[in-house]
């Protein structure tokens, strides 16, 4: 919340998974309930930012109504990396199961989703930058206010268990770039005391990262 806008970074896994994937991932499907608990109705979301278009990050972009996928947040403008959409269309053997077009194609066709190539300011104080590794075009989302910085680093550092630059995931398409870009991130995030948000950590949603010699640690905020 900026005081003028309600901005949602990522929409999670959604409620459109087929039964096989539901058994695997066991989604709780609580996003809308949680938003209402915070006093925000879906109609009050102004901006939605998808760091990339894997189904677990954009699943609640849309919901099914009368058999068609429509915007979950009808008054929002959605933003996503253009390169992500282009890659998803290729349906490569390596990662085609991660891209489910009902999560984004209806929004592109309706003009509600803007695809952006590269870095951009989304709204004053909130910008996106390409940080490759997990995918080629994945964004990190930066929130800057009163001289301080918070960063939703997405799947470049998905949890606090992945702080060590060499601990990549099997899902990472470019693990050597994960290594290089984590080091590049730490070179600024640690001395400048950025608050880092971890998208997949069930216990630590955000923290400050520290380094001593070659060991990395975190201090929960």
Label every model-predicted segment.
Residues 11-14, 53, 83-84, 133-135, ...:
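Active-site metal-binding loops of divalent metal-dependent hydrolases
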Residues 1-33, 37, 140-155:
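Conserved beta-strand hairpin/beta-sheet module of binuclear metal-dependent hydrolase folds
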